[in-house]
Amino acid sequence: MEIERINEDTIKFYISYLDLEERGFNQEDVWYDREKSEELFWDMMDELKYEEEFSPEGPLWIQVQALKHGLEVFVTKATIGGKGEDGFDVTLSSPDELAEEKIEKLLEENFNPVKKESLGEDDTLEFILEFRDFEDVISLSRATGLENLLTKLYSYQGKYYLNVEFPENKYDESNIDNAVSILLEYGLESNLTGYMLAEYGKVIFDVPALQQVRKHF
């Protein structure tokens, strides 16, 4: 199992399906058996104690993502009074549902009617995509339907991240739905923010990043 510190409040685990089986669990346990999934979670947190200074006390947000060869588990300390105030909020997404759920969540959070009434014309929806390697970035740059996206490419802690911006005066829900669907074919949605990447990451290509990647590679 791999453990990565994302920031002060977030830890990312990666556990292969082989490692999962060696620990006495299977994929169905994670998706359909809450008791088993919580048992696996606390096993991972016990191992974390020896790797990182991260206290699991208090409310937590937990997100599990299914990859081809294993699982990514993000654990974030929740702010009291926020979504995690009940103390244990687990989000599990199967491989077939993951992309659709992410798109729906992104649109619901940023384009619900109540929120739009208070937004100005210059408001922008931000989406951060994480890549395993640069070849995936090159492949994405050649995809059709993304030619006009506002994108900036960063490197941070050995990985590549694409900051995609959707100005609300230029994109409607359908446009964003289509674009995000394509983006998620080449990478994973990241928990990092554009602010964090701008502060700690290294800019590889400024806007428009995908066009520049396609031009040079």
UniProtKB/Swiss-Prot annotation:
One of its GO terms (molecular function) is protein-macromolecule adaptor activity. Gene3D superfamilies: 3.30.70.1950. Coiled coil: none annotated. Pfam families: MecA. The N-terminal domain probably binds unfolded/aggregated proteins; the C-terminal domain interacts with ClpC. Homodimer. Enables the recognition and targeting of unfolded and aggregated proteins to the ClpC protease or to other proteins involved in proteolysis. Belongs to the MecA family. This is Adapter protein MecA. The lineage of its organism: Bacteria, Bacillati, Bacillota, Bacilli, Bacillales. The gene is mecA.
